[in-house]
């Protein structure tokens, strides 16, 4: 809720050690919202941080009967399919190696890239692979995994639209890499919002 985020951000800007005492706030000081969101907002001099996230599990739209059809993991084994698919662990290891050999700037650029096969697409690719591999004509139960993920991003996009206090105000959106493809598609498709890539604002451009 916005009121909880407001109290947490105020506690952070006053004394970050007190943030854990905020009623209703269940994130610790090491959480990405605090370490990235609050820290960046404070550095930029923002008075508040908008609560735009919408928490929803992949299985949120599935019934107990649907859950019985769930595979052990929503991650598809790349070795079990005949098309290119990078496993999450392999993707993380590859990105860690690039980070070890490169720079943080290059790392952040890659995380925000939407090229085919980029790190940001891994989550979507595995959701689609799992849903389609376990579906057949007339049986679409596991497509609910994809539907829930898209629905979550739709709720987030709606919250982003309602975040500004005035028309024309710009909003800086900070999200995990896996949300970038879905949010970019939604925000680009809307007639009232125009997403702008953060890449030119990263130094060295």
Language-model segments: what does each one mean?
Residues 1-136, 197-203:
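Structured, acidic catalytic/metal-binding patches in enzyme active sites
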Residues 139-205:
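A cross-kingdom marker for long, charged
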């Amino acid at each position: 809720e916005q009121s909880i985020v407001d109290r947490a951000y105020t506690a952070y800007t006053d004394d970050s050690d007190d943030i854990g005492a905020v009623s209703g706030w269940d994130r610790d000081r090491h959480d990405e919202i605090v370490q990235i969101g609050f820290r960046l907002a404070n550095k930029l001099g923002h008075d508040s941080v908008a609560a735009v996230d919408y928490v929803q599990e992949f299985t949120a739209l599935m019934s107990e009967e649907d859950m019985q059809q769930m595979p052990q993991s929503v991650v598809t084994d790349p070795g079990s399919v005949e098309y290119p698919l990078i496993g999450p662990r392999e993707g993380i290891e590859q990105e860690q190696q690039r980070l070890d050999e490169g720079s943080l700037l290059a790392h952040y650029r890659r995380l925000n890239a939407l090229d085919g096969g980029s790190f940001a697409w891994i989550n979507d690719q595995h959701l689609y692979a799992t849903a389609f591999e376990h579906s057949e004509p007339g049986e679409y139960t596991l497509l609910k995994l994809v539907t829930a993920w898209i629905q979550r991003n739709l709720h987030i996009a709606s919250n982003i639209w309602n975040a500004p206090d005035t028309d024309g105000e710009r909003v800086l959106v900070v999200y995990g890499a896996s949300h970038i493809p879905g949010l970019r598609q939604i925000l680009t498709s809307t007639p009232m919002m125009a997403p702008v890539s953060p890449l030119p604002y990263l130094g060295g451009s």
